[in-house]
Amino acid sequence: MLHRLFGLVKIHIETAGGSGEGEVVLPAVSKSAAVAIEAVIEDGKRRARMKEAPEVIMTGLPFVSMLPILEVEEREEVERQPKVETTFQMKTKELLLLATTSGGIGVILSGVFLFLMQFSEFIPVELIYGQVQTMLKTGIIVVATIVAVVFFIAWILSVAMTYISYYAFTVQKDEENIIITRGLLEKKKVTVPLTRVQGIEVIQNPFRQLIGYETVVLHSAGSVSGDGEKLNLFPLVRSKKREELLTSLFPTMAFPNPEHRLPKHSRPYFRRVHYNWLLPLIAALIYFFPPYGWLSVLLIPLHFAHSAWRHHSASFQVVDKQVILRHRGLLSLYTMYTTRRRVQSSTIRQSIFQERGNVGTLMLKIKSGSWQAEGRVPHMDIADARHIFYQTTPEKK
């Protein structure tokens, strides 16, 4: 915000192999200087491509006659401005929906907790503990009301933070880059070269999915956000428009829903993986909290339903040189779109029980900022897993 008051901007330049800290960081420069720096960088990229172009040897023409041609071509190349098209712009209604359904409340509460930990020696813990005991004696309704008020205030703060952060969110594209701008108090502009894009991940939250919205994340080589956060290509987009928008940005890729489902014999493995903690938890609740602990038995049918849901959601597909992997976490559905040559590592994991059922978990990792992003399909048929594995290993690229 201080930058905008004084007409200044902060420039963060990161290369593909950067660690996220930035090779060049200019804390405060004028807007005109920032535009000039951006123009110099783009001109350098164009000159680098001209040098990489194959050399053309022409015979039969005097050397002097070639000079005007070269001068005209160079002048046209420098003067030519890339055409920028606006692909996506978040509306106010979508921005409010994003703010109200975001998970920022967890960030607020964790920040308050860390703040209290830093100043714990100045906080009268015994006095607060005594007040809590007094409130517990007065009734659970008072305590529940206070907790609800605290969570409501934290939710209001998270809504405000998300709204300010993603205000005027716009995605543009020129011939070589994707340009993302957002922010109200602190306006940010991120430029991602198309050659550095490693994959696209679609995240479908069940609550947003009910009203037809989802989130699209862009994975790029090197840090591009400047502050270490993941880069949201479409923070909130209509599900029916997602494929059209992605195709306009990446015309060489396809973004269908994966068609190949998991076999029926892999369904029991989605249940077995959680038995090692679910059954001891139920036993402990029954032992320590009778008779209400018996209500925990209801977790068993809920677990069966959740496992069947995860099995039904998982799928995969290989489209030409692309790989599409889909799996469901605790609630959200994750779909990874990438190409074979972008895969950095492929892994198949098999337990003893999975070997008996001829199933395994396939995991593909791609570069994402300073780290890696993972696409996976759990408990898929081992033949299908090996087929994708051999196609994405370096020897097969």
Say what each PLM segment does:
Residues 1-397:
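N-terminal basic, Ser/Thr-rich segments that initiate or prime the first beta/alpha elements at protein or domain
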